[in-house]
Amino acid sequence: KPMSEIAGSLAMLEAIKYGLVDHGGSGTLFRKLSGLPAPKVLILGGGHAGLNAAEIALGLGLQVTIVENYWKRIAELRYMLPAAEVVCWEDSTVYNLISNTDVLLNTIYAIPNQPCLISRVVVRGMKKDAVIIDIVGNGIIETMHYTTLLDPTYYEEGILHYNVANMPALCPKTATKALLMASGPYILAIADKGLKRACAEDPALFQSVCTLNGKIVHDEVARNHNLPCTPFNLGMLD
């Protein structure tokens, strides 16, 4: 949760930065100004990241639309963010929204081995001064690939793309404090019981082990970086 909240907040702030010419953008200020129409922000996914991105965007006076697929969450978002438009996913609706948006922000995780939800053709039809920010990674937007903090953006189909996987590294002090609050109980469990017993007793901790003895043991991490994965098991901790 805390990393999603930080990533969602930073995603909107980065969109603002990369709309400016000194960062390779088109020279667009994503801010509501007197006498000018408010820029449009389309957020795919209404979880913790999407909610925080929407809060930043609404604070800037932007027109915000959130696309969510679960009716319960749609109702929650409409209650929490009355100034935002929250819609259920429908291909024709989403594609039309994308063609008119200034900032497209993806927070949806892809299902492995499933086709991209947003094709290259859809991206090609976007406004040429738009910005795409993807805080998740590959698999949702066809033209998206991972970037780094040292080289965060690229142009594809005339649209600026940003896909930094470790965005919370931009604010390490805040991220460390937030992560410690969330991970503290797990750290204490490992210190008290040892890693093997702690993992055996807590499925969430077991599923969170990413690397061990120089090997990637988490399938999603390996897949995202095109590296081999050694499936994790408790016997590896003997």
Regions found by a protein language model. Name each.
Residues 70, 111, 167:
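Residue-level "edge-of-site" marker
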Residues 1-14, 18-30, 139-238:
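Adenosine-phosphate binding glycine-rich loop
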Residues 24-108:
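Glycine-rich phosphate/diphosphate-binding loop of Rossmann-like nucleotide-binding domains
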Residues 79-158:
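Rossmann-like adenosine-cofactor binding region
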Residues 12, 53-54, 74, 123, ...:
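Generic hydrophobic/aromatic pocket-lining and core-packing "Φ" positions
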Residues 2-9, 47, 51, 67, ...:
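Electropositive phosphate-/nucleotide-binding environments in soluble metabolic enzymes
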